[in-house]
Amino acid sequence: RDTENKFADLLEKYETKNKIDQELFKTEIKNLDLYGYGIKGFMLSMIECALDLSNNEVSSKTIGAMLDLGKEMITQPVELLNGVEEVLKSLKDKYRLIVLTKGDLLDQERKLEKSGLSEYFHHVEVLSDKKEKNYSDLLEHLQILPSEFLMIGNSLKSDVLPLVEIGARAIHVPFHTTWEHEKVKDPIENNGYMTISTLTDILEYV
């Protein structure tokens, strides 16, 4: 949200903050098929949105400031959830641990390296999207039956519900910020997945 707020500040002479937020979100969603998920696509969407809202009058200086916002996102430290390393240490020798993420390959590789957690994982996969077919294809490639797979994630839409649909299990760990595109209206609780409040709660179940 911090980047979106700064973006709105850059365009405050053209529109209200609420309108800017709405238009940026629309532009992001429209561009997902072109750019995929990731910071670079977000940067391009910021520029496109700024041009649209300003009727192509936005200055090169302002566009430069938007690029700087994107670079700040790329270089910012990785925020680890409390207990994540404790959980990984406990599970590493018991299970085959896999990172499944979506977005720009370079961005995600950089994040994993910064996190210092790569040693705990047996496999890393960066998907173009997180839908049922993406997961089914990957599990088939890795020779893992859905019934033998447990997903742990913070997004119901991307990390939990698609896995439940293909017969896998999932644990939902809510995060304090969720992108609007990842929100699910009226999710059905206990429909093949469980929700816990902290990562370390996982150790009670696996």
Q: Which functions belong to the PLM regions below?
A:
Residues 60-79, 84-115, 125-128:
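Substrate-recognition element of Asp-dependent hydrolases with the DxDx(T/V) motif
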Residues 4-8, 43, 47, 105:
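An amphipathic alpha-helix signature
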Residues 85, 89, 105-206:
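Asp-based, Mg2+/Mn2+-dependent phosphohydrolase catalytic module
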Residues 17-72:
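A metal-dependent, Asp-based hydrolase signature
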Residues 13-17, 55-57, 116-119, 143:
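Short helix-capping segments at alpha-helix termini
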Residues 1-23:
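Active-site neighborhood of HAD-like aspartate-dependent phosphohydrolases
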